């Protein structure tokens, strides 16, 4: 099945992303510790992440032209996080460094035997965007605008600019935020975490929740990631599901797997693939990401992704 809309071609960037960045402190342990115990860590690593920043880095590695808009703190973590985006070649003209603020951080405990993780995070309130602070003119510069829906009123400003200019709007949402109902009618491609449709609609059955999500807000493509079961899309009255792939060499860390999935999915759309093929590409990029610690180290190049797809048939 093809997308039910055309992506524009006359844009400076293939994809632009407005949303979160973060610096992750990764802590690898043999198994997740029980209460009132001590566990020696196997590895500690500082790594850059954040839903939207990671998606833009992933698309850039795949050979597309991307730009990122978001706020970094003025602390050493912020300097580190910003340098990782810049060094990948992602355009940062709309990035802001907020004086006397701390960049978003996360402490992520990863179980070595499964690769599953638990995240404890913090975000400085000074990094939040008010609607009048949204980067006007940014969203319209990409064929696709990708959002993570933090600061929904500001996201709505950027999304409205994008829609008015013919840009397709994509959103990766994992939680319910104040002002979200005003943003969602502006989203063309809405793919959330496996819990998101239920949380928003109150409907337990996944497929029924996706149908209600589309009926309520009008997104032409809706879906959810399903972890090790792949992903599910609902479009034009049809459900399309693609199973997950195994991480090459085994799963080391699931941190950022959803961000990587979105990048692979959007990559497929941007290069003209069908929804079915794009789902497989999303699952492939997510699987490859999981082969190393951190959200970004194992994100593939175009050649690496093509080789992986050949290997899985």
What feature does the model see in each segment?
Residues 1-71, 76-80, 87:
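Glycine-rich phosphate/adenosyl-contacting loop at the front of the ribokinase-like
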Residues 1-17, 40, 206-313:
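Conserved phosphate-binding/catalytic region of the ribokinase-like
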Residues 60, 163, 270:
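Gly/Ala-rich phosphate-binding loop of Rossmann-like dinucleotide-binding domains
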Residues 87-100:
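A glycine-rich helix N-cap at a beta->alpha junction
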Residues 161-243:
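Conserved phosphate/ATP/ADP-binding segment of small-molecule kinases
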Residues 1, 124-130, 169-175:
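Short gly/ser/thr-rich secondary-structure transition/capping motifs
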Residues 97-98, 108-144, 149:
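Conserved phosphate-binding/catalytic loop of the ribokinase/pfkB sugar-kinase fold
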């Amino acid at each position: 099945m093809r997308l039910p809309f055309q992506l524009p071609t006359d844009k400076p960037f293939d994809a632009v992303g407005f949303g979160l960045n973060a610096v992750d402190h990764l802590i690898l342990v043999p198994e997740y510790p029980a209460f009132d115990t001590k566990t020696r860590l196997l590895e500690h690593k500082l790594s850059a992440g954040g839903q939207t920043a990671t998606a833009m880095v992933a698309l850039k590695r795949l050979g597309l032209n991307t730009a990122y808009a978001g706020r970094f703190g003025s602390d050493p973590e912020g300097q580190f996080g910003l340098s990782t985006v810049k060094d990948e070649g992602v355009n940062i003209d709309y990035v802001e460094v907020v004086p006397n603020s701390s960049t978003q951080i996360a402490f992520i405990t990863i179980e070595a035997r499964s690769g599953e993780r638990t995240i404890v995070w913090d975000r400085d309130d000074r990094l939040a965007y008010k609607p009048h602070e949204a980067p006007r003119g940014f969203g319209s510069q990409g064929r696709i605008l990708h959002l993570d829906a933090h600061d929904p009123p500001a996201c709505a400003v950027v999304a409205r600019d994008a829609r008015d200019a013919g840009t397709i709007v994509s959103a990766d949402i994992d939680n319910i935020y104040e002002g979200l109902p005003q943003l969602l009618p502006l989203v063309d491609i809405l793919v959330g975490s496996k819990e998101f449709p239920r949380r928003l609609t109150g409907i337990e059955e996944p497929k029924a929740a996706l149908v209600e999500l589309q009926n309520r807000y009008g997104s032409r493509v809706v879906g959810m990631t399903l972890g090790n079961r792949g992903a599910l899309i609902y479009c034009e009255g049809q459900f399309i599901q693609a199973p997950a792939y195994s991480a090459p060499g085994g799963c080391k860390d699931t941190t950022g797997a959803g961000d990587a999935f979105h990048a692979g999915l959007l990559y497929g759309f941007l290069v003209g693939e069908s929804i079915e093929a794009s789902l497989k590409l999303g699952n492939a990029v997510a699987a490859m990401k999981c082969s190393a610690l951190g959200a970004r180290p194992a994100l593939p190049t175009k050649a690496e992704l093509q080789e992986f797809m050949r290997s899985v048939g």
